[in-house]
């Protein structure tokens, strides 16, 4: 929950914004939920796994972009009549995802990155699509902040029914002896997995 919400914060999503969340694993799904709570208008979610697609719709996605159906930038530009989106939250993908994010972003737009980019020497930013440095396209990224007050705010969303995280939990285990099994699920990522939970 905290990391996905931080993606929406980094992107500075405001009411009425058109937003694209790239990647709809657990973090991206919570980014979708956060963008919806912040009042996003048209909310695109990029992903392909059926259970994640259904969860993205549940959390507020208005449009699903399946990267297996073609280039995601072309799909976004087609859907927006060539305009692109106001904000992008990067919650998945690889180093080339930034090329896509910058390209689909409107001038003056903002990218919030919460995806760990652990390989490669450089992140490429396309010059023309970035407006040759004059397009006022902002990229913000970082670890999610911690702290008691922040966690209390997030918990209040659960407490008062503004956020339901149950759609994330696809595999439930009872007892510490199942910890390894749950961790292996996260490593292997079967198609029906979003997030496992072990109740101690």
Give residue ranges: language-model regions.
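Acidic carboxylate diad motif detector
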Residues: 114-115
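Rossmann-fold dehydrogenase core element
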Residues: 109-110, 125-168
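Conserved amphipathic alpha-helix within the SDR
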Residues: 72-82
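Mid-domain Rossmann-like dinucleotide-binding core that forms the NAD(H)/NADP(H) cofactor-binding site
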Residues: 1-70, 74
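Short SAM/SAH-binding signature in class I
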Residues: 83-89, 109-110
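C-terminal hydrophobic helical "lid"/dimerization subdomain
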Residues: 99-103, 147-200
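Helix-to-beta-strand junctions that scaffold the AdoMet/dcAdoMet cofactor pocket
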Residues: 105-107
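Beta-loop-alpha module in the N-terminal Rossmann-like domain of NAD(P)-dependent dehydrogenases
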Residues: 90-100
